[in-house]
Design a protein with these regions (language model features):
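Conserved beta-strand in the GNAT
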Residues: 68, 74-83, 95, 100
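A short beta-loop-alpha structural element at the N-terminal edge
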Residues: 15-29, 40
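Helix-loop element at the rim of GNAT/NAT acetyltransferase active sites that forms part
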Residues: 29-43, 87
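Active-site acidic-Proline motif in GNAT/NAT acetyltransferases
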Residues: 102-104, 108, 136-137
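Conserved beta-strand-loop-alpha-helix junction that forms the acyl-donor binding cleft
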Residues: 132-141, 160-163
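Conserved active-site alpha-helix within GNAT-family acetyltransferase domains
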Residues: 112, 116, 136-155
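Active-site rim helix/loop that mediates acceptor-substrate recognition in acyltransferases
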Residues: 44-66
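Conserved acyl-CoA
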Residues: 102, 113-129, 151
Length: 172
């Protein structure tokens, strides 16, 4: 299992790149840390690694799904994204599903570097914006996105169709 930073006193350079198949272990390490951070059911690392390996190899998307941040060769953060074609304004958007920085790498510029990497990708591909959500209780994340210039859109409501709803809808 790749190590994750317990504490970064001098983060040095933050290296960001799109995840590759050989990053499955690093991605799994962050997914497990993210589940613990958000007080979700803890993930089994080997299962997370197998799933990450599948995501990074078999699905072969038209765009990358995960950006990973490394500091001193250690995995420090991730961004999980999807590209959407909304239609109404004929402009593609990137949806930032998750931005997670390992506890020991927080407040070291890793999150900013990840979002900067995504912004550069968007500009290079003609993608007009990044949409994202965060928990309303996550004051640190809200301050972070405010500092980046993110606009809050109160007219939007976040909804989810969980597994049971999917099954019910699919049967009708």
């Amino acid at each position: 299992m790749p190590s994750s930073p317990s504490s970064l006193t001098d983060p040095g350079t933050v290296d960001i790149r799109w995840a590759r198949v050989d990053d499955a272990e690093a991605l799994a390490t962050l997914l497990c840390a993210m589940a613990a951070h958000y007080r979700q059911t803890l993930l089994d690392h080997s299962r997370a690694a197998a799933t990450a390996r599948q995501w990074l190899s078999d699905e072969s998307p038209a765009y990358p799904h995960f950006a990973l941040a490394f500091v001193g060769g250690e995995v420090a953060g991730l961004a999980s994204v999807a590209i959407a074609h909304p239609g109404i304004d004929l402009e593609r958007l990137m949806f930032l599903k998750d931005l997670f920085v390992h506890d020991g790498a927080r407040d070291k510029g890793v999150g900013r570097a990840l979002v900067g990497f995504l912004a550069g990708y968007c500009l290079g591909k003609g993608i007009g914006r990044i949409d994202l959500t965060t928990e309303d209780w996550n004051e640190g994340a809200l301050r972070f996105y405010d500092r980046l210039g993110a606009e809050r859109h109160g007219q939007k409501v976040f909804l989810r169709l969980p597994g049971d709803a999917l099954k019910r809808i699919a049967r009708t």
